[in-house]
């Protein structure tokens, strides 16, 4: 939320009806799971609702970002071609941005990635590879919005977890960690547990 009319750039999370009336220059497709079928009823209906963001709200010749090899790649490429969007992918060595290595140092991670074939790194305390992937989405979106890479790297390390999203809220005397996440569907719970086990294999 902001009342500052001087704001030139803003990053917001897509949500039903929240974006009506906006024109977007850059849009990200992070994933599609079975979390909201109570509202959308069918997986196809859910996908079509998500694609409204790219079909109607994303400006022609705007930027579209998604992960290389996702099952919705065909639909996104079709929209990109129709609207003459600039497509940027995250994932493999041929992608615009690519995660190369996650180096674990106690509770901290050193994230090594390449952008336009040039190597960079930053620190993060976020839990799980899914959050690291989301950080790379944020890095790329900021870069495409004209933010200098030095500024991005200086600030991305300060990003804290969203409340209730793989959030460490405590540490016990036996060094066990208390991690809070509001996942409540089978897909979401599976993702959360697998991401926790990535960082803490004994959990």
PLM regions: where:
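Nucleotide phosphate-binding/pyrophosphate-handling subdomain across enzymes
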Residues: 105, 115-203
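Short, conserved loop/helix-junction motifs that constitute active-site signature segments
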Residues: 20-23, 53-61, 80-83, 199-201
